[in-house]
Amino acid sequence: MKIALTERFQSDVRALGAEERAAVFEALLALPRSIGAPHLHAGLGMRKIHRTGIWEARVGLGLRLVFAFADDTLTLVRVGDHDEVRRFLRGL
């Protein structure tokens, strides 16, 4: 599986504190093996959130990871709190 990072995702990660970055990294390690395995992705709270194939996963209590999955490529789109993710989705 390939992993692609958008510029916006990279910018979001740079804006996080050290603890939040570590939590994002842990979620990223779990994400590829959790796709297609409901019993594994339950802990990440993965769910499809947009009809265009955008998904969300929890990173701790306050952060959400937004990604797309197609053609064996996981594209990391955004990371932010619930409100930031909602604003992003309104723009789609």
Which role fits each region the language model picked out?
Residues 2, 8-15, 21-22, 58-92:
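Enriched for short, Lys/Arg-rich terminal
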Residues 30-58:
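A short, surface-exposed loop/turn module that caps and links secondary-structure elements
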